[in-house]
Design a protein with these regions (language model features):
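ABC family nucleotide-binding domain
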Residues: 1-205
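Conserved beta-strand-loop-alpha-helix hinge in the C-terminal portion
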Residues: 209-225
């Protein structure tokens, strides 16, 4: 993936070739400027590659128009961000229904789905609260519910615990672990080793290339124990 900054071409990713199978749990790591965010944007269909192909669930999405990419994002991918990205004037329930509105789900059905999903993430008693009435961990749970409500096959989590304390971070990672056990592919970007160790596979980027790609032995030990 290349970007033009003034008269300079910046090669954000170079000759990156990775294959992520259905129901994998993958952590993407690397220092600032390594290409983590660029790779996440490509995987999430928020951007398209300058060259090469991206096959998502059997479909080449690398040359698709924006409208098609938006439809794929809505149906196939759930996003969880470090800053939650909740609408401040909307309640938890209203925030979670948004992807269903874009998908054209009837009102009664989308409210029922949103309520069910909020219960699933442990916020059944906070549905009418707005973001400023919730703790950081509760806001991230709302964001996770919003990511899950359309039943996507892939969850992309970009520094999901970056704004949380250590105990709340463990709670949120426990929820992502459960989501993976329930059959979702989970891909998370993190700079924290303890967060990455929740994943079965770790991909380390350096200067826009895949520096390491390996099975996480600590995850294997956790599963065995």
């Amino acid at each position: 993936k290349n970007y033009q900054v003034g008269s300079v071409i910046v090669r954000a990713l170079r000759s990156v070739s990775i294959n992520i199978e259905k129901n994998e749990y993958v952590a993407i790591m690397g220092p600032s400027g390594s290409g983590k965010s660029t790779l996440m944007n490509l995987l999430g269909c928020l951007d398209t590659p300058t060259g090469g192909t991206y096959i998502l669930n059997g479909t080449d999405v690398s040359k698709m128009e924006d409208d098609y990419l938006a439809e794929i994002r809505n149906k196939e991918i759930g996003f969880v961000f470090q800053t939650f990205n909740l609408l401040p004037r909307y309640t938890a329930l209203e925030n979670v229904t948004l992807p269903l509105i874009y998908a054209g789900v009837p009102k009664a059905e989308r409210e029922a789905l949103a309520i069910e999903t909020l219960h699933h993430v442990g916020l059944g008693d906070r549905m009418t609260h707005k973001p400023n009435e919730l703790s950081g961990g509760q806001r991230q749970r709302v964001a996770i519910a919003r990511a899950l409500v359309n039943k996507p096959s892939i969850i992309l989590a970009d520094e999901p615990t970056g704004n949380l304390d250590s105990k709340t971070s463990l709670d949120i990672m426990g929820l992502l672990d459960e989501i993976h056990r329930n059959g979702n592919t989970v891909i998370l970007v993190t700079h924290e080793e303890d967060i990455a160790n929740h994943a079965a596979r770790i991909i380390r980027l350096l200067d826009g290339t895949v520096h390491q790609d390996y099975i996480n032995e600590k995850y294997k030990q956790k599963v065995v124990s």
